[in-house]
Each structure stands twice: as C-alpha cells, then as structure tokens.
Amino acid sequence: MKALQTDNFRALCQEYGISTKTGYKWRERLLRYGLAGMAEQSRRPRSHADELAEGVVCEMVRLKQAHRHWGPRKIRELYLRKHGTAASESSFKRVLERAGLTEPRRRRMRAAQAGRLWSGQRAQAPNEVWTVDFKGWWYDVEGRRCEPLTVRDEHSRYVLELRRMPDARTASVRACFERLFERQGLPGAIRSDNGSPFAHVRGLLGLSRLSAWWVALGIDLERGRPGHPQDNGGHERLHRDIRTELEPGSAQQEALDLWRQEFNHERPHEALGMRCPAEVYQKSQRSYEGSPEDLEYPGMHARRVGPQGRIGWAGIPLFITSSLAGWSVGLKPLVDGRLEVWFGRLLLGWIDPTTESFLRADIRPQEAGQRKPNM
C-alpha cells in the first residue's frame, strides 16, 4: 500500500529494485482491479489465431495450399488483396505452422565484392540491368533433359524469359535474345556468370561472340567472379524457386509459361513493397532495330578484326581476340605514342609501338610475357 501513500514514487521503486515504469504499471493494476490485479496475467497476444473465424482460417490454408512455396507474408498479402482486410502476419504464421504448411527459412549468404566488368552498383530502375543464366538441367517425366534459359530484370524482379532451349549454343541463345529485344527493347547492361556462351573465361575481357554482339548493340557487360554465384544472387534465388516449384514435373514450355505468369503477375515480393513484378516493370525506351553491320569510331582509326582474331597495324598483324571476328575496333592515339584499342565503349588494351605488341587491358604488364594468345 506504500505505492498509494508515498510522495516520492521513484525512490520507492528504487527501494524495491524495479523500474519506475514497472512500478506505475503495478500501481495502475492495483487501482483498477484491487488485489486481484496483482496476480500474473496471460502474455498471449490479444489477437490470437484461435480467435479467428473458421472461414478465415480455412481461407488461409486454402491460399497456402494453392501456393505451397510462398511464405506467410506473401499469403497474407494475397488474402488482403482478395478480401480487403487481413489478420496480422504473426496470425498467418501461427495458422500455417499449426497446419504443417511452413518450412524453416534458409539463411542468405552475404554478397561478396564482385570482379571484372562489374560496376558495383545495383539497378535503380527497370531495364538498367538484366541478369541471365541457364537453370541447372533436370529430366522431365518423359526422360528428356530440360535446361531453361532464364532472363530477369534486376530492379523489378520481372522474369523476362523462361525458355526451354534446344541447346546452349551461341546461335540458339542469340535468336532467343533477338526475340526478347524485339518485345521489351534493350537494357543498359546484362549481368552473367563467366560460362559459355555468355563469356569466354580466358578470353580478352571474357568476351564471347554473344557478349560481343551485346556490346555492339550498346549494352554494357557485367560479370561476377568465377566460382562465386552469389555475385548474381538474385538470379540464383530465382533458380531456387524454379527448382523447388517446377522439379520434378513437366518441363513443357506451357508449364514454364504458367509459372512465369504467376511469378510476374500474382506473386508479391517483400523487396517491392509487396507488389508484383508486373506492377513495377515497364518496357525499355531503347528499341531494338536489328544488329548493326559494324561499329563506327569518330576521331579514331578503324581496323576490322579478321577471322583469326587479328588486325593489321603498320604492316604488322596483331592478335586481339577471335570473339570480335568481323567487327571493327577503334585505335585512339595517345600522347606517349601508344594507341588505345576500343570495341564500342569497351577499352580492350593498348598497342605499344616500341614492342610492336598488343597489351591486354585485363593483364598486368608483368604477366604479358607469360601468357599465350587465347580467344
């Protein structure tokens, strides 16, 4: 009863070793409920899953069963869109846990610092960066191998392409990208790993015939480090979703199209404020007008790369890379006598007139004499 009589409530709380906030809480209970209010009270949430109407619980379970690989947050967002109001996320989690419809969440690996041709920046708008890869192959129910090509807009998470390919050759992948560019326009950059046909792991700046074509279209190249898939972590997450939700099962193109439709137009994403990718993505303003016959270099000397990857300079054949065969490069004179070698907006290296050699931009000077020409 001292709490009702003291003039120094703070000192009284210190005497009993409790905070002032706790002291006021107990005094309020005493004034409101008498001695009965001093008993320990239940800590269960006031809005508990047990208090939800049976129809609400059934609808939660039904939505989860229709989207088995979605978490409670996405299921709640879907419920909210359908009914206009929804219980708390924790209520959804408890209901789905009791129904045995949840799985432990895996810890994400931290993204590491990326390597060559990597800007270090993430897309801030649609079409700034597209990501591409081949989903690891599996066999469908008919025993046929399926290895889809996946293309994704980094900012909006919009899956631009999920295509079962006849093979992974350059010609097949280029034809797929030509159709994609015609539909969606051109991105600012394309991020890939260092595998074929997107890159040549030992070639000049990793250039392949496919990525050289991208550069000719004015598209920048971004790549992760060899052996570090987390450098393209968002795309790897997409592949985990595909593996979980589509394998094993039909690998027909119709099934892939249905999955892409749901992912883009129905599935909410936390990183997008629970919006769907289709609500964020829009076509590129850079239209695709076909492949250029060649590149022009105003103010530079142009040299066509031959079938063996060489150019002629001062009567001397210099090996550049066979990935650029048929394309022209630009030679820009420097004040020290050297010449920069450019392909589009990509600096390839330098011609040193004193040694009559080409110095690659991706090899340190001390390594130049130790490397043999590659693609």
Spans of model-derived segments:
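Mobile-element integrase/transposase regions
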Residues: T85, R94-Y158, P166-G188, V215-A216, ...
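Charged alpha-helix within mobile-element recombinases
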Residues: R209-E289, G330, L334-V335
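Double-stranded DNA-binding cores of transcription factors and transposases
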Residues: M1-L31
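Basic, flexible linker segments flanking DNA-binding modules
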Residues: L35-T131, W137, L205-S208, C276-Y288
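Mobile genetic element proteins and their domesticated derivatives, centered on retroelements
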Residues: L12-C13, G23-W26, G34, E59-M60, ...
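C-terminal, beta-rich DNA-binding module of retroviral/retroelements integrases
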Residues: N264-M375
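Acidic/histidine-rich, metal-coordinating catalytic segments
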Residues: L180-L204, R225-G227, N232, M274-P277
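A structural microfeature
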Residues: L160-E161, G349
